[in-house]
């Protein structure tokens, strides 16, 4: 993962470096770099996502449904896929629980239908099919693997049309959720069940359903206006990452000023180093507590 993080910054450096390479005075470098933070952030995020997609796709070649030894290469590929997907939930959180999530999972290899809402789902993408108008809530899991001390069970999952998997709901390997069904919060899929049923609990039992009429333009079929407004709001999710990069740059800027003021002064090298260390110390300390 560290390797992918480093690689994701390379295109941004390639873009920005020519803009400051000819500047000889450091006071002029940082203001120029500030102007490039938005472009650098977007390019870094896009490169990171592309790198994750490539790695997950490559690992998917090894991962096929079945039972495998816990010490096999397939088990290692499954483990690495889970690690990458979990890290992505943190590093690429702005694209989760948004209109971009279905496209992101398609890029990773999942089959995603129309008008699907997906939050922070954990899954093995290429083994998952989420059909039209379905909803997967926060921390839901699909095509999850089963483990013992000696084997790992890998299987596919299909979420039927207009079905709902609640918060932390689990749909295991080789299990499908039929159309118009509900797996409630903190519940598991009971296996082969009838369409239109609802299930609750870790040892799931069926619960009654209440018929409610609602406007489909506010749920399954939002208007174009709602889609556009949602897209505008969700595009703003990258702004906090831009501010994070801004703080990184400002920290380096302040440390550079302190270094240049004392290191090239009339003080001895020992005195300059002592003053530089003394004055620079509060900067990273205060930054880490923001």
PLM segments and residue spans:
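Structural signal for interior beta-strand "rungs" in well-ordered beta-sheet cores
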Residues: 105-107, 111-206
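Hydrophobic alpha-helical transmembrane segments
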Residues: 23-43, 259-285
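C-terminal segments of enzyme domains that contribute to small-molecule binding surfaces
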Residues: 1-19, 154-166, 170, 197, ...
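Conserved small/polar residues in nucleotide/adenosyl-binding loops
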Residues: 288-289
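Membrane-proximal soluble regions of multi-pass membrane proteins
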Residues: 73-103
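Membrane-interface amphipathic/juxtamembrane segments adjacent to transmembrane helices
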Residues: 63-75
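Alpha-helical transmembrane spans of integral membrane proteins, capturing the lipid-embedded, hydrophobic core
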Residues: 37, 41-49, 238, 242, ...
